[in-house]
Design a protein with these regions (language model features):
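Catalytic-histidine neighborhood of serine endopeptidases
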Residues: 46-101, 111
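Active-site substrate-binding loop(s) of clan PA
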Residues: 16, 61, 94-96, 112-145
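Extracellular/periplasmic catalytic domains that process cell-envelope and extracellular macromolecules
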Residues: 16-20, 44-45, 85-87, 97-101, ...
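Beta-strand/loop subdomains of soluble extracytoplasmic proteins
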Residues: 69, 82-94, 131-134, 147-159
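Active-site-proximal beta-strands of protease catalytic cores
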Residues: 23-28, 50-55, 128-141, 172-175
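Solvent-exposed loop/turn segments at secondary-structure junctions
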Residues: 31-34, 51, 57-59, 100-102, ...
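N-terminal activation segment of mature serine protease catalytic domains
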Residues: 4-55, 94, 102-105
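Active-site region of chymotrypsin-like
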Residues: 20-35, 110-120, 147-175
Length: 175
């Protein structure tokens, strides 16, 4: 999930969701002929179709390698609750790079026609985030709906999480 920090006085979950949810994507990874599939959330971070996600979303745990087939689903104009309708905007994805240690993966949507059509989630300065700041998360919980919204607060900041240099994380009460 992607969490978007917001100043407390500007914290309007409905407005933030309306302005950013189209830059949130559903990602699936699978192997031909297998029923098991990985599912997770990603964020479009550039107008030419680069998507940031977690490495565990694109790794086949049985093989310890990235899935050969990666798909990205874009958010429809309106979420219906019907899986087929809500996942009709499907594109192939190319794995650009990943780090299992940092649990990050960079994908690229394989369709030039989507450039500049969707909002981009922009990065901001993480040094401006403080414990107690409100956040929202938009994503696809394992046993939940698609493009869901949850709110919470930053509860902790952890540097070098898991003793991995550079893996700095915020703990939130969002899910």
């Amino acid at each position: 999930m992607i969490s978007v920090p917001a100043a407390a006085e500007d914290f309007n979950p409905r407005k933030i969701y309306s302005e950013t949810s189209r830059a949130v994507v559903l990602i699936t990874g699978f192997e031909p002929g297998q029923r098991k599939m990985s599912k997770g959330t990603g964020s479009i971070i550039s107008s030419d179709g680069f998507v940031l996600t977690n490495a565990h979303v694109i790794i086949d745990k049985n093989k310890g390698q990235p899935f050969n087939n990666l798909r990205i689903f874009l958010k429809p104009d309106r979420i219906s609750g019907d899986l087929r309708k809500d996942t009709s905007l499907k594109y192939r994805a190319e794995l650009v790079r990943f780090s299992e240690n940092l649990d990050l993966a960079l994908l690229r949507i394989r369709s030039p026609s989507i450039s500049n059509l969707f909002p981009i989630l922009e990065f901001s300065d993480s040094d401006l985030v403080s414990i107690g700041d409100p956040v929202i998360a938009i994503g696809h919980p394992e046993q939940g709906g698609l493009w869901t919204l949850t709110t919470g607060t930053i509860s902790s900041h952890i540097n070098n999480y898991g003793n991995i240099p550079g893996k700095n994380v915020f703990q939130t009460e969002t899910s």
